[in-house]
From Swiss-Prot:
Molecular function GO labels: transcription coregulator activity
The protein's name in its UniProt record: Mediator of RNA polymerase II transcription subunit 4
Region of interest (Disordered), ranges: 120-181, 240-278
Keyword Transcription applies: yes
Gene Ontology CC entries for this record: mediator complex
Biased composition (Basic and acidic residues): 124-142, 160-172
Amino acid sequence: MEDVLSTHFDRIEKALSTLVDSIAAYNPSPQAAIDLVAADDQLSHGLDQLSRHQANHARILTLRAQVEALEEQKKSSVTALATLRHELHATPATSFPADTRPVRFDELLQYAKNISQYTVPPTYRERAPEAASDKDRDKDDAASSGVNTPAHAPAQPDSDAPKDRDNADNKPAEVTAEEEEWLEKLQKSQIAWYPWPSEEKIRIGNLSKLMYWQARGKDVDDFDIPAHEEAQRKGLAGVVEAPPEPEPVAEPVQAQAPRPARPAQPQATFDMFDDLDD
């Protein structure tokens, strides 16, 4: 590209020199002016070509950088795949026994739902005991009242410092607001809480039913316990019927003896004016 531009510059320089010499000799040459204009056009075209060349060169450098980056990415990907393949071949294969029973996902989710109410969250922490703080409060109350205070208190040994350090190291983890609310509700309910179900709940659960039917010789894998219980309930409902209500019995009406008639009382008559008739 430099040679092409040098040629254009030499041509325009010669055309310009010829035109200047003709003007200086008082004999201007029109052809020299035309050659100068043509040399200028060729120089402009060469400069445009140089601009495109520089843009293409920058584009080539960018593409080379991208090629190098992609090459490095390809090498790292191949290395990772080789490492993963080596780890997969080194991983021991899991061999399941022949008597393995497949478990459906809905059955597994139902089992997790049943035991979720008897489990605690992994972040559960019991509240720190308050016995030490109560003792310190009692000591402070006794000191403020002055009761049983000796005239000259003996110097306390420095053996409490390691204990305080141990207590600081053994501090329980902080309890979140949600856990604190749950603990407050549990404390207010005044109900003994255990992280496992009670014996009564275990006896009425599905595991107890499985043990019961297995002890009676049923194959729990093929035996449908809910369907059998439903059939038993329907059978009992058909056999046991409500006793018919007793029909009311008409009791004989006893004939009452006629009451004795009362003697007729004499009717009172008005006899005030009987004396006047006489």
